[in-house]
Amino acid sequence: MNKPILRVLRGEALPVPPVWLMRQAGRYLPEYREVRAKAGSFLGLATHPEWAAEVTLQPIRRFGMDAAILFSDILMLPWALGYGLHFAEGEGPVLPKLEEADIDRLDFSQLIPRIAPIMETVTRVREQLQQLHPETTLIGFAGAPFTVSCYMVDGGGAKEFPRTRHFAYTNPEAFDRLIARLTEATITYLSAQVEAGAEVLMLFDSWAGLLSPLSFARWVTAPARQITAALKARHPSVPVIGFPRLAGTLLQNYASETGVNAVGMDTSVDPAMARKMVPAEIALQGNLDPLALRAGGEAMRREVSSIRQAMAGHPHIFNLGHGIVPQTPPEHVAELLNLIRTI
């Protein structure tokens, strides 16, 4: 396949890097807000294949991104395991605070039927891309077990997830059990996405940087290695991108020990240093500050130029260091793509 992102994930450095953006389908787009209003709720949108496929494709139509990423959420996995999830307006995800007894109550029997609408979305998007945008790669994704566990144990978003970390330190065997169950479910979930049409998989470990090096090895690197190995055994041609956000120097361990094809860099990572830390064949993805994108203009141009120079000659997918913020003018995204493709 000659798709630019697949070429980079095979270890090829392209003169113009392919580009897609985390949260490229989202509230900054007026067409997204229209569909979201129709759906009435985030879950109503994420579990409606027609609408979810539509918002997945919106940034492809508008900007010509090199990849479409499934419109969903990292917490759809606990939802599919029967673990209560709702999105409170203005507050984000809310879940019951997990206790040890809840670990064995996670309902694997409902996983496949509950993810069926999400898989239908993947299939719809892949079919439309093949017809209308054949150079565009479809990315499926999941939250990594540690990050998903953070939301489950703390009961939603929390500053530095103190309850999760306390639970992990004081009851490591139980926490191991939770991570193991989520690892198993993640393999099933991501494998189903490939079977439905995903060409690349991404593992988001948004809170990996909260852990000590010892805990990082146990609850970030080891599960990522297990997930990647299982997926490559089932789907040898499907590349995996890992994103251990805020991992700092532990990015090196993650890149060399997990088997991923590419590593996502958050905004704090110096791309020139990242190149030295990862094996030459491992692609890097990132890492423009989303606030530089929001600002646009000269500030954005300086940052883009710096990243491009640092990554010249290395396999690179241009992206952000975190998701697009809702206040971003769509014109700035168009300006970014023009900038990347004309430098």
From Swiss-Prot:
A GO CC term assigned to this protein in UniProt: cytosol
Pathway where this protein functions: Porphyrin-containing compound metabolism; protoporphyrin-IX biosynthesis; coproporphyrinogen-III from 5-aminolevulinate: step 4/4
PROSITE patterns named among the record's database cross-references: UROD_1, UROD_2
Binding-site positions, substrate: R23, Q24, A25, G26, R27, D73, Y151, S206, H322
InterPro entries: UROD/MetE-like_sf (IPR038071), Uroporphyrinogen_deCO2ase_HemE (IPR006361), Uroporphyrinogen_deCOase (IPR000257)
EC id: 4.1.1.37
Primary localization: cytoplasm
Gene3D superfamilies in alphabetical order: 3.20.20.210
Subcellular location per the Swiss-Prot or TrEMBL entry: Cytoplasm
Pfam families: URO-D (PF01208)
GO biological process, one term: protoporphyrinogen IX biosynthetic process from glutamate
Keywords annotated in UniProt: Cytoplasm, Decarboxylase, Lyase, Porphyrin biosynthesis
Taxonomy, superkingdom: Bacteria
GO molecular function: uroporphyrinogen decarboxylase activity
Catalysed reactions listed for this entry: uroporphyrinogen III + 4 H(+) = coproporphyrinogen III + 4 CO2
Function, in words: Catalyzes the decarboxylation of four acetate groups of uroporphyrinogen-III to yield coproporphyrinogen-III.
Family that this chain belongs to: Belongs to the uroporphyrinogen decarboxylase family.
Quaternary structure annotation from Swiss-Prot or TrEMBL: Homodimer.
PANTHER family per the UniProt record, alphabetical: METHYLTETRAHYDROFOLATE:HOMOCYSTEINE METHYLTRANSFERASE RELATED, UROPORPHYRINOGEN DECARBOXYLASE
Protein name: Uroporphyrinogen decarboxylase
Organism phylogeny: Bacteria, Pseudomonadati, Pseudomonadota, Alphaproteobacteria, Acetobacterales
